[in-house]
Amino acid sequence: MDRWVKNILWILSIAFLLLLLVQTQRQPFSLECLALKNDPKDAPKPELKWSSYNDGSFQEQTENYLRENFAFREFGIRSYNQYCYSLWKKTCNSFFCPGKDHWMYYRPGVLDYYGREATRFFSSEDDMHKYVDHQVDMLNELRNILKQDFGIELLTFIAPDKAFVYPEHLPRMKHDTKIGVPAARFTQKFKETGFPNIDMTSWFAAMADTSSRLLFMPMDTHWTFSSAYGYDSLFRFMDSLNGFGIPRMRINGIEEAPYPGRQDDEATLNLLFKVKNDTPAYSADITVESDSTNRKPRVLFVGDSFIFAFESLIPRMDLISYYENWFYYDKVYKGFEKREYKIDEINRLRSILNVDYVVVYSVGYQWCRGTDGFVEDALSSIKDPEKVEVALMMNEIEAKPYLMEMIREKAEDKGVTIEEMLELDAKWIIENEKR
């Protein structure tokens, strides 16, 4: 009897291992799960080549593939995540913090509301004040140089923080009042020094008290239809700084859709089933008014993911002629076609000097990090006459299509990027003009 049981267990073990192997390699059992959103990383099946074997990349790709595709790994992980969320209202994604009534928040935003996020960055209230005050001083210095020497406007806005707009759904947590909220200090110093800034968090909090529609979806932390109010105010504010003549947005109404609103953050929880969503989707009916007296500006946005609503919901091509998005001062997206670069792959000063407005923004809790290094880098570059000369020459060359065609051909011949070739030619022209 014992031998018979052992044989059965042995056969079942072999069959189970074969099932895992087949599922890993061929995946015959397709499990329908909620699609992941935001920024998932693919782990493609590796292809064995002599070059990839020789340089070790095949081994690395194989390990990544097996790590992500081993048998029923995804189903197992999602099942555990669903168990934690359904029974205990907990998530296995440390960035998210479940609130009451199926509301979801970013954990740093919740900590910021309770005064605890700043403790990760500063040792005391005085330390935080010194940091913020220095950041504001640098922004004012950069603004003065850009405005006086180049006619470029620099401004900021603090994007609305869901935790401060709808605190009634937050989880309970102890307040820490030793250091304070950096975004509030930034707002205060901007006002005291006269730096142009819009604090959208306090504005949206006031709007939420009277609005019959939710300004944020319960399971999403980004603005949707409400972004129309934010960007309308932003562009009106920009135009008021210098009378540029920016076309005017007109919000003709808010329409309710017959389906639930987007809840992109839900997909990052990696659950098996959708979370209950009774909140309808809303869309803003937006038109842009323009005549012969209006001009469409060039704009550089330096900030976070609150720009996505501008790219998907606002008729931006009717408002502006060109824009760049410096996403977390890491990735760069140029133009309406969103040509992608790393921040270190471009001449940042020439981008700054090639626009009419520079808009630095971020949601409230992220002001703990100031401008993520933007203002320090920009000040250092703009105070260097040689860097300014090269940047201006690059922009001058780029404005001439026939020269840019030559740049593209030379870049292809030399095996460098167009940006690198453009900078090399700008330096060559400057050196020859000085001879």
Residue ranges and their predicted role:
Residues 1-435:
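Extracellular glycan-modifying ectodomains
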